[in-house]
Structure formats: C-alpha cells, structure tokens
C-alpha cells in the first residue's frame, strides 16, 4: 500500500547515512592521532619552538593530538613518565641523568650562555653582590645552576650571597623592582623589561662566550626504545617549527602572544627576535655545552667526574632527518 510518510522517511535515509559517513571521515585524523603530552619549564623565548609547533599546526600535521603543559617540574614529570617529551635546559636534564635517570636531549636551541645578570641601581659591581639576595626560579633550575657556575669567576660563591627561590620570570621581575631581591639572571629579552623598570645590567653572560647547552628538546631513552617513530615525527614537527620561526613572523608572534600571555607588540617582537637570532636550522645539541655543565656539576655530584658528555644527547633521529635532505629542503 502506498504510504507517502514511509516514502519520505526512505528518502531521508541516504542523506542521513551520508552525513554519518562524512562525520566519520572527518573524524579519522583525530581518531588516528597519537596522544602525546609535552612539558615546558619556563616562559622564556628559548621555549618558543614548542609553542610555534603547536600554534602553527605542525603537531596536528604530523599526526599528534598534543597536550602542551607548563610546569615547574618538567624534568620530574618527564622522568616519571607523566609526559613524553619536554622543552628544558641542558643543566636541568643533566642533574637528573647524573643521578641515575635516563633523559637525553635530541635537539638543542641554545649553545652558549646568553643571560643577563640584572641588579638594582645601587649594585655597581659583582663584588657589591656579597651579602645580597639573588633570586632564582627554584633550586636546581637553570637560573640557579648558571648562577652558581658564574659566581666563582668573580671571587664569589653561593655562600657569599643569599639565594632565594622566587619563581618564573614575571615573579622575579616583580621581586627585583620591589626590592625583595637585589639581583637575578634573566634571559633575553626579559632583561629589557628589567631595564624599563630602572634596573641595570651587571653582567652580560654572552660576552663571556661560554659553551653551555641551554634549552632543548628532551625525551627519555625508554621513550626512544618504545615509541621511536612517535619521537621521530615529533622531532620532524619541531624542525619544521624552527623553519617557521626563521621565516614566518606572523605565526611565530601569535604563538609568543599566546604562551607569554601578552598583547604588547613590542614585548612580543622582542621575545620572537631573541629566539629567531639564536635557534639554528639544524638544532644539534652541543657536546662542548654539556661538557661545561658536567664539569661544573662535578663539584656537587660525584657521578659527574666520570660522565661522558656524549651520553647526554641522542642525535640519531636528527641525523636521519638531516641526511634525508628534509631540513635543507625546508629552506629552498
């Protein structure tokens, strides 16, 4: 028996089926994406390659559903297996490795010390720091380890000053301008903010030309063994992000605005330029930079005396990308 209502329903079925099929097809990339958690340890420009990789869509492009996490305990979460990779300094990961953990740096962003030691106007020389309060991010963090490496060069030790755990860059800027600390190490371009607040540059570490592995991409040997292809694809996205930093200011600045939480165009540009001028297209970690870190650590960690700097890096995946011509092709 002819039934108009039944016919109407039947006409809708193909449309409904097509809609469901289309939704499934569109969902396939996200369903197939590898979930990955990545930590970064500071809001300094040296961490920016990771930010650009996320904002520039390169993580999605390379098959990831990524959770980017800011934490003051980046190395602890990495070693514990709570995250898969981390953006952190060589000194931070070295301390963990020297104490038995298995982090390795697979790409490096900085290979010399670039910080500025910023001080209140009444501090005229390094000797004036004797008995004064110097703020660091936290004990064991890069700002702390670099400071105790530099002080002896000027006849000071960490016992001659009072070291205070203050927090990340914004916290230290507030503490410095407010007078609760007398000096602190700041990465470019954050030292410019300190200058705007009336502080002075007591020491430019870049002038010392010291090989020192700064920020880089770090994972664990466990992760490399279990999910090597995942790490390979992430490194590919990271190298592509470096290319964006070098060639695409618009996307890069968008990433800096998001992660540094500012709309100030001058501050965004200062931070972006600081990274752009530093990062290399082929981000091989510095063996000499790790040698400096290990030699310094030998006074505090006995295992450092026998450590080999080459054990702190794994460039096998980066070499694969390099030899394939992938990196060179990005810049043609």
Predicted regions and their residues:
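Short secondary-structure boundary segments
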Residues: 90, 121, 188-189, 221, ...
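Periplasmic-binding protein-like
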Residues: 40, 109-119, 197-227, 231, ...
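Secondary-structure end/capping motifs
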Residues: 225-305
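Short, glycine-/small- and polar/acidic-enriched structural segments
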Residues: 34-178, 182-188, 201-211
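N-terminal secretory signal peptides that target proteins for export/translocation
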Residues: 1-12
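Ligand-binding clefts/hinges and TM-proximal coupling segments of bilobed small-molecule sensing domains
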Residues: 142-157, 161, 237-270, 313, ...
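Conserved C-terminal helix/tail region of periplasmic/extracytoplasmic solute-binding proteins
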Residues: 295-332
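Bacterial N-terminal signal peptides
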Residues: 17-29
